[in-house]
Amino acid sequence: MSLFFITFFLIYGGIHFYVFMKARAAFASGITINITIGAIMLFMILAPVIVRLTERAGHEELARILAFVCYTWMGAIFIFFLTGIICDLFRLAWYTSGVLWSRDFSHIVSSHRFYFFLCLVATILVVIYGIFEARQLKIEHLVVSTDKIPYEVGKIRIVQISDVHLGLIIGEERIKSIVKAVQMVKPDILVSTGDLVDVQLDNIAGLAAFFQQIHTPYGKFAVTGNHEFYTGIDRALEFTEKAGFRILREEAVDIHGIVTIAGVDDEAIGGLQAGSNVSEERLCAEINNSQYAILLKHRPVPYAGSLCIYDLQLSGHTHKGQIFPFFLITRLFFRQYAGFYRLDNGSFLYVNRGTGTWGPPIRFLAPPEVTVIDIVRKAD
């Protein structure tokens, strides 16, 4: 965790420095203005920590306001940084062309103020749209055929939510929309593939009751994500159970002879991927191969040793980058980063884009989703 935070704040601070230098070049402001801007940026760099401290001190409303401001700023400054890099590459291309062709393109290359405002306008537009998109919950439908579903059943509907990140930003309003969407598609089984909660639970304990409104014939199941461990695993588990979920921790459950649902803890519990693999290997011995088996695992990292046992793995974690084009970074760490994948030995993996948001309350070209998976009996 400490390495993660050090890396994050170094990158986040570097991005602020880049934007500060762009503003300085565009406006040639005096020392007083530069110090003021620098102080504001320093506050925004430290704001995520300030939000957590404010929340822990019991000032929920203040923490909620600060969270929305600082995380919206976080998204905005990342977007400004990316558009700034694109503009810099464009200017470099013009400069190089001028040198190669002996042409004077200095009027295009040197207009710092124009490019600053271009980046600013692009950032504002993306942020406004991104806040809107983050609230537009999309229902994704998926049909998987198998000969393992009993004839008399024919079809079973699994609904997946993931990465809701209940907390200061994702609250009652968003939970109501999620619950409404889930109820509308009438699941046989509801699963949560981790990161249901994101902060201290004093402020969100009452939200568990909304999930209790979802009734399914065969139950609700959940696994832990990394944020359950960051929040505090005991209290996160307590909240999840109050919400009506059965938490699968290295456990497999036979659902009336129709399907098997298995789940493993996120690797954050021990910090080693190998720990999760051991859990999967042990669970494999408990699975009936003649029955359709679904593995709930927060991170989309299929383990080769269990591919022959599980027919379908449901995961989340990646958010599909949440803000385009950050999925490019996500792809560096996760080969399967969003959507439906066919794995070796005929197994499948589905990676949910996330039902909520983490950090910035913004999504751009990566809308939140509730996934509806119909597992149907193959026609003879």
Residue ranges and their predicted role:
Residues 1-135, 380:
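Non-catalytic terminal accessory segments
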Residues 135-149:
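Alpha-helical transmembrane signal-anchor/signal-peptide segments
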Residues 145-380:
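Soluble catalytic domains of enzymes that build or remodel membrane lipids, polysaccharides, and related
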